[in-house]
């Protein structure tokens, strides 16, 4: 609720503070780049030290409390620093959290388990933007919206501490330990990362989408977070569906998801309100598949002792290509929205081909 509520308005908030489209794309991409780079270190440390809970809790504190501080930002430079801090906090917690989730989901099916996690996550992701939309509707302003999000931030930390008390040793939840042959991470994992890289590079971050919708006056400002909430609703449902399908047909489900999500960019950037609404639903479907199945597949490729490291590598590669794609699409947008569409569609379709090949190798 906290950081998704904030992400629904950071694009237009930066615009109000005087940032250009290139700046919005660069800040969004840089936050992801630095954040995902930190995950490489965080994942390695979580495996070496076994301190999954302390690392996770530290990350959540940074991740959540950077958001209400945005209410005090008076320049786009300061806002950008806080946005990047929020991403770094998420980076610190994510590998350790995902490793703990991989243990907890081993009995129910990792696709379904990670899908359920993503769906529950989206309950807050829907509520957060809607709360911000209500604040804007009541003429509270962007700063007021950020300040109100302090409440769910505090509640989230409380719930996290309760979970730490109830389940102090997550590895004990593992039903069985996967066997990894040879040294290092398996070749299939690296091939899989190539497909992930194309998905990340071509997926337009919401701040740039919100910037486009606001700058072109396609929708009223209070509708921008509502569209994000709609996307998060589609995300939640898609996570459950694709997670369920992954446990039955494997990697092939990612090819299906990428093919579907490749259609969002033309609808969002080249149409009016109705097409943008449909495009945001498809955007949310793609995000749901990414946030559930992409992580579940890593757990099934990697042994228990290397899983934190593998998630760190996975997230770092994802972040590097997300940054490169976001920065490039921000610059492309300043020339033409059509260039953004062409780049996004092309990279998504390339990922389809790679995932089909990975799926074929996994079954032979």
Q: How would you label these PLM feature ranges?
A:
Residues 250-294:
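C-terminal transmembrane helical hairpin of 12-TM major facilitator-type secondary transporters
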Residues 69-83, 268-279:
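Helix-loop junctions at membrane interfaces in 12-TM secondary transporters
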Residues 144-161, 340-356:
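Symmetry-related core transmembrane helices of the 12-TM Major Facilitator Superfamily/SLC fold
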Residues 38-51, 136, 238-250, 333:
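Helix-to-loop junctions at the C-terminal end of transmembrane segments
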Residues 162-182:
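Flexible cytoplasmic inter-helical loops of multi-pass small-molecule transporters
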Residues 82-123:
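Cytoplasmic helix-loop-helix junction between adjacent transmembrane helices
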Residues 1-33, 191-220, 224:
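Helix-loop boundary and gating motifs at the non-cytosolic
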Residues 54-68, 150, 252-267:
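Structural signature of the two symmetry-related core transmembrane helices
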């Amino acid at each position: 609720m906290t950081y998704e509520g904030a992400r629904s308005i950071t694009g237009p908030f930066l615009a109000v503070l005087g940032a250009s489209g290139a700046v919005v794309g660069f800040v969004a991409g840089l936050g992801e780049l630095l954040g995902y780079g930190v995950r490489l270190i965080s994942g390695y440390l979580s495996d070496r030290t076994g301190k999954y809970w302390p690392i996770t809790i530290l990350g959540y504190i940074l991740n959540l409390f950077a958001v209400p501080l945005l209410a005090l930002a008076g320049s786009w430079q300061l806002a950008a620093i806080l946005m990047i801090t929020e991403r770094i906090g998420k980076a610190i917690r994510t590998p350790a959290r995902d490793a703990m989730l991989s243990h907890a989901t081993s009995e129910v099916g990792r696709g379904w388990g990670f899908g359920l996690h993503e769906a529950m996550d989206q309950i807050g992701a829907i509520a957060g933007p809607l709360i911000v939309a209500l604040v804007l509707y009541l003429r509270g302003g962007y700063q007021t919206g950020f300040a109100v999000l302090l409440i769910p931030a505090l509640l989230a930390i409380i719930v996290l501490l309760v979970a730490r008390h109830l389940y102090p040793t997550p590895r004990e939840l593992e039903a069985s330990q996967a066997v990894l042959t040879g040294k290092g991470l398996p070749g299939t994992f690296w091939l899989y990362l190539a497909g992930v890289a194309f998905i990340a590079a071509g997926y337009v971050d919401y701040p740039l989408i919100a910037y486009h919708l606001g700058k072109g006056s396609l929708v009223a400002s209070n509708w921008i977070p509502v569209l994000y909430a709609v996307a998060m609703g589609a995300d939640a449902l898609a996570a459950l569906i694709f997670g369920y399908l992954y446990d039955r047909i494997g990697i092939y489900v990612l090819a299906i998801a990428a093919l579907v999500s490749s259609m969002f960019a033309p609808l969002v950037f080249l149409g009016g309100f109705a097409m943008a609404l449909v495009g945001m639903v498809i955007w949310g479907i793609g995000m749901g598949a990414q946030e559930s199945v992409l992580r579940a597949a890593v757990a099934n490729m990697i042994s228990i002792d290397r899983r934190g490291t593998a998630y760190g590598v996975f997230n770092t590669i994802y972040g590097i290509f997300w940054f490169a794609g976001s920065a490039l699409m921000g610059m492309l947008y300043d020339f033409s929205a059509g260039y953004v569409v062409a780049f996004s569609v092309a990279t998504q379709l390339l990922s389809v081909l790679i995932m089909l090949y990975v799926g074929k190798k996994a079954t032979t």
